[in-house]
């Protein structure tokens, strides 16, 4: 039924001088002539099935390019969709993979981040989910892999965030949050604290009574 519907609607759309664009579920049946496929499931690899049939495609994998997901530890973040796509996850994504067939790169139209707004009640909620990850998306789209440098990007982000402050845009500061993982070891728990920013200093205490921030020395 999906294939029949897409064949009919594809013919109609083309008769109006327009292009058909659709999600990668189209690869499960008939793909309209000339249709552009958006690869979203998992890492977007279903779009490559369309490329094998000569179709152009856009990479927008849910695992790293769905901006509705949390940007850091969920207990620090406003309620949104499940899963984490940190600023670093977005920045490190490379749409062109080394194991691709040579013709795939020529059919790739670009990369896209997607945002669904069922958890956004105000424009400010959209700002929080989009910024600063939108800057990382720009780096993915415009920078070659060998040109990317996470540390330099963070320095640029500090200046960019000052610009957002001036504009009154309420961006996420999740890049400064501390993530912890706990692992059972010999009847005890081993705790690992980490931050996606290497310049963040992590201080802690084993004292259960909080009185003031931990001293530097």
Predicted regions and their residues:
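Conserved, mostly hydrophobic/aromatic
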Residues: 13, 37, 134
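Polar, glycine-rich mid-to-C-terminal structural blocks
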Residues: 54-58, 65-70
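Conserved small/polar residues in nucleotide/adenosyl-binding loops
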Residues: 210-217
